[in-house]
């Protein structure tokens, strides 16, 4: 993937950039692997906003991604196409299996049309192959990692992300997360070899607010420009700083958003690198 920069023909185009989509081999997705999506605008069943800054955006169809890959062990698959997915930052690869099945997976770095991938304990260590952590050598970069055996990939799924397998001890494997956190995961959990592709996506300059609206993201308003009834930082005569430490609209201090008593915290060996305001 490469990034194409626009000429500054308008204020919105100045500095803006877009992917050149050279890796994409097909623009029409596989119809059998698509489902309709109904937008909720960040509202719950009662119509109240539960997630701010969401709403609108271009209509999308959801692509069914195989995050488990446990029912095609031992069956080789050919990469038929690399496709764009509007629901995620990574590209996706359409696999044609020898038994006739078709599946979508996340497209790792280096995977191209015509390559052959496989899954299972005896799969080779090459990008796109999926196998249990116990069968992957230490030092390998992996992505789409399960947190529980058979639970489907949960970790390292966005464009350019990867996890390093540091080693294995007894029934657990030690993983270095993209954040720097070191976490233990059951060796029966599966992972895909390689890094997630489309890494240059992080360098795209969206250029104007309208492009973010196309993505379904609404404006984020600062608390200090609101009224006191709307935010703890609101009000005051003239331009103010809020007059207190940063808090959420509901008065909770900024940072420390992780659940403190999460059951899986006991498997964290070393916390992620954090700033002072996020330190525990």
UniProtKB/Swiss-Prot annotation:
Entries under Gene3D superfamilies matching the protein: 2.30.30.30, Nucleic acid-binding proteins, Ribosomal protein L2, domain 3
Stretches with biased composition (Basic residues): 268-280
Xref: NCBIfam families: rplB_bact
PROSITE patterns to which the protein is assigned, alphabetical: RIBOSOMAL_L2
Highest taxon, organism lineage: Bacteria
Source organism: Mycobacterium leprae (strain TN)
GO biological process: cytoplasmic translation
Biological role: One of the primary rRNA binding proteins. Required for association of the 30S and 50S subunits to form the 70S ribosome, for tRNA binding and peptide bond formation. It has been suggested to have peptidyltransferase activity; this is somewhat controversial. Makes several contacts with the 16S rRNA in the 70S ribosome.
Protein name, as recorded: Large ribosomal subunit protein uL2
A UniProt-annotated Pfam family: Ribosomal_L2
Chain's gene name: rplB
PANTHER family per UniProt: LARGE RIBOSOMAL SUBUNIT PROTEIN UL2M (PTHR13691:SF5), RIBOSOMAL PROTEIN L2 (PTHR13691)
Keywords, sorted A to Z: Ribonucleoprotein, Ribosomal protein, RNA-binding, rRNA-binding
